Amino acid sequence: MPTINQLVRKPRVSEVVKSKSPALENCPQRRGVCTRVYTTTPKKPNSALRKVAKVRLTNGFEVISYIGGEGHNLQEHSVVLIRGGRVKDLPGVRYHIVRGSLDLQGVKDRKQARSKYGAKRPKAA
């Protein structure tokens, strides 16, 4: 434990918290335009073709973001909304695209966890 004198000479320095999603700049979401829509493969031990998009945001950042759910209608120049949240097995992917917002449609025929995928409530049959 330091003495008062030592603390006067060199005060305690608090740790600087680094943002996990710097491109959002403390906003909950950001709008952007897709510059490239493609698939990529995850790290070992997983194997798949994950759908991702390179997005140029309104604040000038260019980020890679993940397109969740089965099937999508994104193309180059689609306007999308991105939120934070990384994909653990895709290095460099620190953002998710919000389904059912702007140009990206919700997941078709989704019955459970619909709010996460922008799916409307199915008509009662």
Swiss-Prot record:
PROSITE patterns: RIBOSOMAL_S12 (PS00055). The keyword Repeat does not apply. The modification 3-methylthioaspartic acid is found at residue 89. It comes from the Bacteria. InterPro entries: NA-bd_OB-fold, Ribosomal_uS12, Ribosomal_uS12_bac. Part of the 30S ribosomal subunit. Contacts proteins S8 and S17. May interact with IF1 in the 30S initiation complex. This is Small ribosomal subunit protein uS12.
